[in-house]
Amino acid sequence: DAIDSLKFLRFITAVAARCGQMVNAAEIARDADINQTQAKDWLTILETLGIIFYLHPYSNNLLKRLVKTPKLYFYDTGLVCYLTKWSSAETLECGAMNGAILENYVVAEIRKTYLNCGKEPYLYYYRDKDAREIDIVLEHDGILNPIEIKKTANPGTELVKVFELLDKASTPRAKGAVICMKPGLSAIDRDNYIVPVWII
């Protein structure tokens, strides 16, 4: 009925406002004025319909103190912008959600690229109890590729220091990348690339 439709709109808007964040059903339920069970059920519906997906935390028996909560992303960043009322690219550029929506876009595009090729995307994120985080950990062929996503045109070497956290894992770390607003492909150092967003 109409009341349920309004509740669902509030719900999906609350979900969109949290794209790129760790899932918190209690907060979503509070903002949508529904209970947690309903919020979890509706999240399942969104996932089943291919509207959202989860990025699970990377885990390894040699890495300690890792978080266990997945992060939530939308396949369509245009839907996120519509629901969170960003009317143009110009207003979003200066808005509070620009970093989150850029991250959502990059993660979704990488995932869709794998799926469109008929491959399973082994994508994760890294976050420990000290809030140290790597946006994407790509696992393939027995190696890990760490990726940071930043809304900057001039990424510095400090952005890739966090990649060293993966060196304690049993799976070896390979080349990393910072995906950012720089127009051309280049290197940040001998082990890490600077990749412009438009390439993905």
Feature map (PLM): residue ranges:
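Active-site ExK catalytic segment of metal-dependent nucleases
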Residues: 139, 145-154
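Domain-level recognition of nuclease-like catalytic cores that cleave nucleotide substrates
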Residues: 182-200
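Short, hydrophobic beta-strand segments that form beta-sheet elements in well-ordered domains
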Residues: 172-180
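Arginine/glycine-rich "motif VI" loop of SF2 helicases in the C-terminal RecA-like domain
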Residues: 115-116, 164-173
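Switch/connector loops and helix/strand junctions flanking conserved nucleotide-binding motifs
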Residues: 81-82, 156-158, 185-189
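Accessory nucleic acid-recognition modules appended to NTPase machines
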Residues: 1-144
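Active-site-adjacent loop/helix micro-motif of nuclease/hydrolase catalytic cores
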Residues: 153-163
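Conserved beta-strand segments of alpha/beta enzyme cores
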Residues: 122, 175, 191-193
